[in-house]
Amino acid sequence: MLYEILYSLSDYISGLNVFKYITFRTMLAILTSFFFTFIIAPPCIRWLKKLSLTQHIRDDGPKTHLKKEGTPTMGGIIITASVLVAVLMWGNLKNHYMWIMIISFLGFGLIGFIDDYLKITRKNYKGLPGRYKLFAQLLLASSVTLFLYFNPKDPYTTVLSIPFFKQWLIDLGIFYLPFAIFVIVGSSNAVNLTDGMDGLAAGLVGIASIVNAVLLYISGHAVFAKYLYVLYIPGTGELAVFCGAMLGACLGFLWYNSYPAEVFMGDVGSLSLGGALGSLAVITKHEIVLALVGGIFVVEALSVILQVGYFKLTNGKRIFRMAPLHHHFELKKWPEPKVIVRFWIIGIILALLSLLTLKLR
């Protein structure tokens, strides 16, 4: 919106040419979403408290979490608003990929909002029945995937790119559709499962957003993409602005969500952020890199799958003391801040390894 105005004026005012650069607008998106989050969070937290939109803590969870009862939740509304403001201000709204991301982000956020609202009003942790939530996620992910599948401007619609190799491409054909849907829905739920400690998910999503911004910028830049043997997909570079908005919003939210949290993002935040990461990976064909940079998310989700499966097969036995994995370490007497910081450290290392894939080709 603001970008369009400034861009049109750049022909008359030479100093405004700087707004043509994606890198500059990405930085502005980071700052805009950060300060917007920082400013609106306090009144929003008070508003959530006033409406009694507070967290219900499970009785079978770690006992240290019982003191969090009554903490405002649904703070993901703050993140959603901040990302939208920054994207609408500094993003190129004529770019169709940008609109795909906005729809995906808002769609998963809406599913999370309904889930959170039902949890609060029913005063339990179940919320939206699993089959309905999964159906809504599959429907939204299918819409995103089908739009990309029938996009005539994308020459790599059904291609899976293998990192570490020079343009090793596998054309999955029609089978790419269920794969892409799995990536988007899986990413959304994996971030949701990781959001069980103060600041854990926000910090890891922020780290992943940095890597995604770099990958997107390169994918949308013909020269850099050719030099680094990355698939060149015109128009995807603009999504670096979206990643910048996510990073700024996560940093601003961390100010209030870090231990001890003043507010939780809830499913409205975790599902929208996870869905966005999955959608970004599918758009740029970096699905495998997403599994690397989001390694913590993958492990957290796998820990739940293994725990549930093993529990059913062995009639009540467990692999972990509790799943997701971060609760396992909590029950091993690791202080919550230590678990969070150590997972962040692993996330940073995985982010660096993900960026290394650009040169190891």
UniProtKB/Swiss-Prot annotation:
Pathway: Cell wall biogenesis; peptidoglycan biosynthesis. Its cofactor is Mg(2+). It is a multi-pass membrane protein. It catalyses: UDP-N-acetyl-alpha-D-muramoyl-L-alanyl-gamma-D-glutamyl-meso-2,6-diaminopimeloyl-D-alanyl-D-alanine + di-trans,octa-cis-undecaprenyl phosphate = di-trans,octa-cis-undecaprenyl diphospho-N-acetyl-alpha-D-muramoyl-L-alanyl-D-glutamyl-meso-2,6-diaminopimeloyl-D-alanyl-D-alanine + UMP. It is an enzyme of class 2 (transferase). Signal peptide: none annotated. The chain crosses the membrane at residues 28-48, 73-93, 98-118, 132-152, 168-188, 199-219, 235-255, 263-283, 288-308, 338-358. It is found in: Cell inner membrane. It comes from the Bacteria. Its main location: membrane. CDD domains: GT_MraY. Pfam families: Glycos_transf_4, MraY_sig1. GO terms for molecular function: metal ion binding; phospho-N-acetylmuramoyl-pentapeptide-transferase activity; phosphotransferase activity, for other substituted phosphate groups; UDP-N-acetylmuramoyl-L-alanyl-D-glutamyl-meso-2,6-diaminopimelyl-D-alanyl-D-alanine:undecaprenyl-phosphate transferase activity. Keywords: Cell cycle, Cell division, Cell inner membrane, Cell membrane, Cell shape, Cell wall biogenesis/degradation, Magnesium, Membrane, Metal-binding, Peptidoglycan synthesis, Transferase, Transmembrane, Transmembrane helix. Its EC number is 2.7.8.13. GO terms for cellular component: plasma membrane. One of its GO terms (biological process) is cell wall organization. Belongs to the glycosyltransferase 4 family. MraY subfamily. Catalyzes the initial step of the lipid cycle reactions in the biosynthesis of the cell wall peptidoglycan: transfers peptidoglycan precursor phospho-MurNAc-pentapeptide from UDP-MurNAc-pentapeptide onto the lipid carrier undecaprenyl phosphate, yielding undecaprenyl-pyrophosphoryl-MurNAc-pentapeptide, known as lipid I. HAMAP family: MraY (MF_00038). PANTHER family: PHOSPHO-N-ACETYLMURAMOYL-PENTAPEPTIDE-TRANSFERASE (PTHR22926), PHOSPHO-N-ACETYLMURAMOYL-PENTAPEPTIDE-TRANSFERASE HOMOLOG (PTHR22926:SF5). This is Phospho-N-acetylmuramoyl-pentapeptide-transferase. It comes from Thermodesulfovibrio yellowstonii (strain ATCC 51303 / DSM 11347 / YP87). The gene is mraY.
